Amino acid sequence: MKAVILAAGTATRLRPLTDTVPKCLLPIGITTMLGMTLDNLLQNGVKEYVIVTGYREEQIRDFVAARYPGLDVSFLTNTRFAETNNIYSLWLTRELLAGQTMLLLDSDIVFDPGIVALLLHSGHENCLAVLRSKTLDTEEIKVRTDSAGAIREISKEVDPSTAFGESIGIEMFSPRFVGRLFGLLEQKIVLRKQVNQFYEAAFQEVIDGGESIFAVDVGSLPCLEVDTPEDLNAARAFVGSTSRFAKNKRWP
């Protein structure tokens, strides 16, 4: 199993905070979003990592080297970060993920480590974390499921009234699914030049081709995607009020 963390974007909605710092390294209490993600994965026994960087990538590499010496991590650079979306960053990992189970995470999520445990112990080879405890609108990536919990539709365009919940950007896929996914990404990126989509567009095509991804409800476990200054303030308030994040041996 390898964890893939996508951290290439410029985070324009958080400017000027991200003028000189990548979003995943903005301070969140005594940590950062990337630091929290790595800590949560390590707590769940994940040992191998792939981080896709782009914007201000040297800061991310320096951060990981300083805070996580000895971590088994490979870095890949999305040199086209200013003109592509996360589907392209994911495609860059194809050689390192061949034959591997993949845990895929966006780098701008503040979340409870129990969410990773839910996926690992869900009983599903292919699944993603879904938040149901919020009002949905057009901004979120939403999922619609069948009666067995398999996802039938995933996109921002899913009707909120029929949606099971919001996909929060944490997924787990089997080696077989990973092979199918990267085969499709090769077509989308190389042949169709669809480099500026969300990776959920590829998930949808794999689902339409007969594969299943199951929705795992995170229940009351907290999670928050940070896109705006308001989100960042909410994330900082959450971390500041949660005792288990108050002390970490990796932080001063």
Give the positions of each predicted feature.
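Conserved alpha/beta core of the MobA/IspD/sugar-nucleotide pyrophosphorylase nucleotidyltransferase superfamily
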Residues: 1, 164-252
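N-terminal nucleotide-binding beta1-loop-alpha1 segment
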Residues: 1-18
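Conserved N-terminal catalytic core of the sugar/cofactor nucleotidyltransferase
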Residues: 2-5, 31-101, 191-193
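Short catalytic helix/loop segments, enriched in acidic residues and glycine
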Residues: 20-35
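Conserved beta-strand segments of alpha/beta enzyme cores
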Residues: 24, 72-74, 150, 212-214
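A structural signal for short hydrophobic beta-strand segments in well-ordered beta-sheet cores
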Residues: 25, 143-145, 215
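Conserved beta-loop-beta/alpha segment of the NTase-like Rossmann-fold superfamily
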Residues: 68-141, 145
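Conserved core of the sugar-phosphate nucleotidyltransferase
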Residues: 112-189
